[in-house]
């Protein structure tokens, strides 16, 4: 985003996702730790809020003060051509589909669990943290090169149909 390069967003970016701030996660976790009714049960600890991937990436771009150059690419294309990156499980099996959680189970055991950090605020905080901590900004030239190849392939496909 900072360099104005295309940002690959799987599919059309409209699937819903949830991001839970660590402070909000901690409220749920601590509430379950000493609760005997939690023993032997599985819980997910998430916010009730959802955003599309388009909204998530736009929020990050806004926090950076940069325009989002979104490049929507079919998830199965990314999975097939992921090379060294396993997009099958994480993308096709998880992030490409809308995920909205029912938090009623944890709220029965931890009734005061209220997520107070919105997804947008959490994303802005994360961006600011990363900008102020250069050690978190680890370049990955191999992944950048792969993303460039995907962007180039999409541009070639577009040009092939524009010629008609």
Regions found by a protein language model. Give the residues of each.
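Basic, glycine-/proline-tolerant helical and adjacent loop/strand elements
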Residues: 114
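Glycine/small-residue-rich pyrophosphate-binding loop that anchors the diphosphate of NDP-sugar donors
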Residues: 16, 95-98
